[in-house]
UniProtKB/Swiss-Prot annotation:
GO cellular component, one term: tRNA methyltransferase complex
Classification lineage: Bacteria, Pseudomonadati, Pseudomonadota, Alphaproteobacteria, Hyphomicrobiales
Similarity comment text for this entry: Belongs to the class I-like SAM-binding methyltransferase superfamily. TrmB family.
This protein's name: tRNA (guanine-N(7)-)-methyltransferase
UniProt-annotated catalytic positions: D135
Gene: trmB
Keywords attached to this entry: Methyltransferase, S-adenosyl-L-methionine, Transferase, tRNA processing
Length: 230
């Protein structure tokens, strides 16, 4: 599969890029700290070289929100290089503010469409991809905007190494069912869970997220899916 160009994939990201006005501290952190962590497409041919510290593997989180899960995992696994992908500026600002206060050398950030990065990374260079509480696009006419769809699964399969892991968490039953159908139908992936407790139980070391806490408080039940690259 050839890499996508920015022109070819123009408009593939759906949703707002900016929400509420950023606080002064967030604006200052973006200006001061984001350039240190931000990567661009021409630099990803050698992913391990993106990090100033030695890393044994590369992991991605697509749509990291405020970054609490991304940064928690990076602390747990200091020998893994984490690339967080978030086009939404407000989420990026929250993560960068935390990095401004407590730098983490095994973290790098990407602020464009995840598909562009997945297409440029070397084949089989990623050990884990996480998609946690993505926008479910609940209206039927918007389902084509969901990230989990055949073209993006092709890109995930390309980037993941054999045995690599794709994780998906959501509190929207329809999107969970959709993801199970789409991923199980793709020849490059295998669903690794066999019991209900497997997908009802958070992943090992799961720190939770602010969004998840709100969902549970509202009575919604999260599901945690895991797939392996065959």
């Amino acid at each position: 599969m050839t890499a996508l160009s920015e022109t070819e994939h123009k408009g593939a990201f759906y949703g707002r890029r900016v929400g509420k006005t950023l606080r002064q501290g967030q604006q200052q952190a973006l200006a001061r700290t984001l350039p240190r962590y931000l990567i661009d497409l021409p630099t990803v041919a050698e992913p391990a070289a993106l990090f100033p510290c030695p890393v044994d593997e590369i992991r991605l989180e697509i749509g990291f929100g405020g970054g609490e899960h991304l940064l928690s995992e990076a602390k747990r696994f200091p020998r893994a290089g984490y690339i967080g992908i978030e086009p939404f500026l407000n989420g990026m600002a929250k993560a960068v503010l935390e990095l401004d206060l407590a730098p983490q050398e095994n973290v790098r950030l990407f602020n464009l469409d995840a598909a562009l990065l997945l297409a440029r990374l070397p084949e089989g260079s990623v050990s884990q991809v996480e998609l946690l509480y993505p926008d479910p696009w609940p209206k039927r006419r918007h389902w084509k905007r969901r990230f989990v769809r055949p073209d993006n699964l092709d890109l995930l399969a390309r980037a993941l190494k054999p045995g690599g892991v794709f994780r998906f968490a959501s509190d929207v039953p329809d999107y969970v069912d959709w993801t199970l159908r789409e991923v199980r139908a793709h020849p490059a992936f295998r669903w690794t869970q066999t019991r209900a407790d497997d997908w009802r139980t958070p992943y090992e070391g799961w720190p939770g997220t602010r969004y998840e806490a709100k969902a549970i408080a509202a009575g919604r039940v999260p599901t945690y899916l895991s797939f392996a690259r065959v």
